[in-house]
Amino acid sequence: MTRILLLLHPTAVTDEQLVTKVKSEISSTNSDADVVQHIIDRVANKIVKLENNTFDEVIYINPNEGEFNRQLPVSTITIIYDSLVEDGVLKGDLPTNQNLDAIMSGFIVGEQGNWIKPKAVGESVSIPLKKKEVAVGGASKQCLPSFKKLSSTHAAVGLTDTSASNTDEENDDVNSKRKLQETKLAYFSESDDEDEEDQIIDENNLISEVRTANLVVPKKCELPNGKKRRKACKDCTCGLKEIEAQETSDKSTLQNSILNQMVQSANLEAMKIEEKMKNAVKFDDNDLAEIDFTVEGKKGGCSSCSLGDAFRCDGCPYLGLPPFKPGEVVSIDNFGEDI
């Protein structure tokens, strides 16, 4: 069974349709896949610990645009590398400017931009070699090398012992060993001289005059007093103009991402307020029985508010008004005669 890990950026949590779409694509390709999802901040802060050699695929979901907004800490890349099995793949919204960090963590960058965990290379094993055994008298024994002592080189000329049978043979051996030593000394002395001559190389001879003639040296953005410019000049050739343009684009990208987050949060708050307005309490005529006594057919708690002050309670809102019928508009027009 294939195990897949979804690493969600915090902004991807607000877009439920995006996460649902990715899960449906996974289920269409791998119906028996075991999908686990975590927010990448919790993994980076080690609140959630991932087990080593567990997941076959890790999919990183980050809806933000721009390489700056998709960068991953090197420590997080190492955690993801350890959680993958051999030949495991990390794919999704990966930053293309962090391929070197991925390679340093152990990944291999694929042709489609995916990061692949390679198989472990087998360790080298040292094989001990047995010494050659020499059979002596039917039994194998380990023999040490034997050495022969050289005779003195200051032998008297013309004085030989004719009684010895092997005198000429010994002289031939001594002469051949002398020649061998002389040839070895001559060989090594000549080779040392040649090495010393080869090691001393003038670096100026490696550069031809044709190449140095057409070199273009960029002009430094410096003021006459030796101080550097704060801003790039009009015809900048030292690269300061490109650095400023990159900084400006990074700032604008960061501002756009912050504004997008603010817009998304404002939309969520507006939706919550609309839902609260839909659930607001509204009263109908039946619910206003104890509130508005002028509605026809409605009576107060004492059922005598319309009869007059003699029948009204102490806290009745109609104290001082003449008797009326329920539903009748009460108007007072006779105050002009008393004035």
Swiss-Prot record:
One of its GO terms (biological process) is cellular response to oxidative stress. It comes from the Eukaryota. Coiled coil: none annotated. Residues 302-316 are annotated as: Fe-S binding site B. Monomer. Interacts with TAH18. Interacts with MIA40. A motif (Cx2C motif 2) lies at residues 313-316. It comes from Debaryomyces hansenii (strain ATCC 36239 / CBS 767 / BCRC 21394 / JCM 1990 / NBRC 0083 / IGC 2968). Residues 221-238 are annotated as: Fe-S binding site A. The C-terminal domain binds 2 Fe-S clusters but is otherwise mostly in an intrinsically disordered conformation. The N-terminal domain has structural similarity with S-adenosyl-L-methionine-dependent methyltransferases, but does not bind S-adenosyl-L-methionine. It is required for correct assembly of the 2 Fe-S clusters. [2Fe-2S] cluster binds at C221, C233, C236, C238. Keywords: 2Fe-2S, 4Fe-4S, Cytoplasm, Iron, Iron-sulfur, Metal-binding, Mitochondrion. GO terms for molecular function: 2 iron, 2 sulfur cluster binding; 4 iron, 4 sulfur cluster binding; electron transfer activity; metal ion binding. PANTHER family: ANAMORSIN (PTHR13273:SF14). This is Fe-S cluster assembly protein DRE2. InterPro entries: Anamorsin, CIAPIN1, Dre2_N. It holds the Pfam family DRE2_N. [4Fe-4S] cluster binds at C302, C305, C313, C316. Component of the cytosolic iron-sulfur (Fe-S) protein assembly (CIA) machinery required for the maturation of extramitochondrial Fe-S proteins. Part of an electron transfer chain functioning in an early step of cytosolic Fe-S biogenesis, facilitating the de novo assembly of a [4Fe-4S] cluster on the scaffold complex CFD1-NBP35. Electrons are transferred to DRE2 from NADPH via the FAD- and FMN-containing protein TAH18. It is found in: Cytoplasm; Mitochondrion intermembrane space. Belongs to the anamorsin family. Residues 158-206 are annotated as: Linker. Its cofactor is [2Fe-2S] cluster; [4Fe-4S] cluster. The lineage of its organism: Eukaryota, Fungi, Dikarya, Ascomycota, Saccharomycotina.
